[in-house]
């Protein structure tokens, strides 16, 4: 009897130990995934780890669109050691042909032993097909480890594949009198240096930033990314100026050809053709969009357009008018004050 009880305790300890090990490997894979933040659109951030005999033999995270996915990077690093390994991946392996081949097929061909997948991919092209293909090949698939964390890091992708629109985050500063002030101009900052650097870090991992015409007229910002650290990995997101009637001068910094990155004028038929033509000659793209009931750019149509361009994330940095419009239309997903 005592031996039987001892065996149960020992088995329990083994189960707890293995569960903890699975969680730790998945957490490591999640850490890899976030290294790709802001660099994978329209694909999700994914991390993958291959483990064999208690050692990590391969790891990777998703490359920019068109490049290898996390699983392929990990398989390449593992080489022959991939055979018989256990895979920990933060999102269901894809099962369709896009710019690259199906990751599920690559895992099968490599001879992996089993797969731990944090969460199913809601993309209609995948949506359980990757897991099914692995199981059909005789590879056990376990899901649910670190599921909440995996869903959290890919909220923008999950929204995108369902709605076709980007994840919208608002960033604004509030003065002591409770008023919203723009926080991207050179002369109108009301926040400290630490907060300003935070904004630049947010820009560095977002696909597009958006301001209204009023902000540009008041502050004439560059809307570029300026980091004090990690300067080798700076990215300037697409700059979108919402200007329904074309009030902002082509001489504005945001439109200047020497300003790093690309700019877009989101406007309506109210803007003069000559104004748009001048901006186009400076390399600015023109998005002529429908008007809303107030004669302004229809923001829902604008989000559709951003999604069509394959962008998953949008940072709204405008003042009270543009922020209020997004809130009124129910288009805000997240707010950072």
Q: In which residue ranges do the predicted regions lie?
A:
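N-terminal amphipathic/basic-hydrophobic helices that include classical n-h-c signal peptides
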Residues: 1-17
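Short, basic/aromatic recognition patches
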Residues: 21-41, 160
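Residue-level signal for inorganic ion chemistry
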Residues: 29, 47, 94, 134, ...
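Short beta-strand scaffold segments in enzyme catalytic cores
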Residues: 45-52, 172-173
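Zn2+-dependent cytidine deaminase-like catalytic core
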Residues: 50-149, 238, 264, 268-271, ...
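Residues at the N-termini of beta-strands
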Residues: 114-115, 208, 313, 334
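Active-site ligand-binding patch in enzyme domains
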Residues: 159, 167-176, 180-312, 321-324
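Short acidic amphipathic segments
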Residues: 326-334
């Amino acid at each position: 009897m005592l031996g039987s009880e001892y065996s149960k305790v020992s088995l329990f300890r083994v189960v707890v130990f293995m569960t903890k090990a699975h969680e730790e490997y998945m957490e490591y894979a999640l850490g890899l995934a976030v290294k790709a933040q802001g660099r994978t659109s329209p694909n999700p951030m994914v991390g993958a780890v291959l483990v064999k005999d208690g050692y990590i033999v391969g790891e990777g995270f998703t490359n920019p669109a068109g490049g290898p996915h996390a699983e392929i990077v990990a398989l390449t690093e593992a080489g022959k050691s991939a055979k018989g390994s256990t895979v920990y991946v933060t999102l269901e392996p894809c099962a369709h042909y896009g710019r690259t081949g199906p990751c599920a097929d690559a895992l099968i061909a490599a001879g992996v032993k089993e797969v731990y997948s944090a969460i199913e991919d809601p993309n209609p092209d995948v949506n359980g097909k990757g897991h099914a293909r692995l199981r059909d090949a005789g590879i056990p698939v376990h899901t649910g480890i670190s599921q909440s964390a995996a869903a959290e890091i890919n909220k923008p992708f999950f929204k995108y594949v369902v709605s076709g629109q980007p994840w919208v985050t608002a960033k604004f500063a509030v003065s002591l009198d409770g008023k919203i002030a723009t926080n991207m101009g050179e002369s109108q900052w009301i926040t400290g240096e630490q907060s300003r650097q935070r904004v630049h870090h947010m820009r560095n991992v977002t696909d597009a930033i958006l301001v209204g015409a009023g902000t540009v007229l008041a502050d004439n910002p560059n809307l570029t990314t300026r980091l004090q650290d990690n300067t080798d990995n700076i990215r300037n997101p697409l700059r979108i100026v919402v200007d329904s009637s074309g009030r902002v001068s082509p001489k504005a910094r945001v439109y200047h050809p020497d300003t790093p990155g690309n700019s877009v004028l989101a406007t309506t038929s109210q803007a003069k053709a000559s104004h748009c033509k001048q901006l186009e000659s400076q390399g600015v793209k023109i998005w002529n969009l429908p008007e809303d009931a107030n004669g302004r750019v229809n923001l829902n149509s604008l989000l559709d357009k951003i999604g069509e361009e394959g962008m998953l994330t949008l940072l709204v940095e405008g003042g009270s008018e543009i922020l209020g419009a997004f809130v009124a239309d129910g288009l805000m997903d997240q707010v950072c004050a």
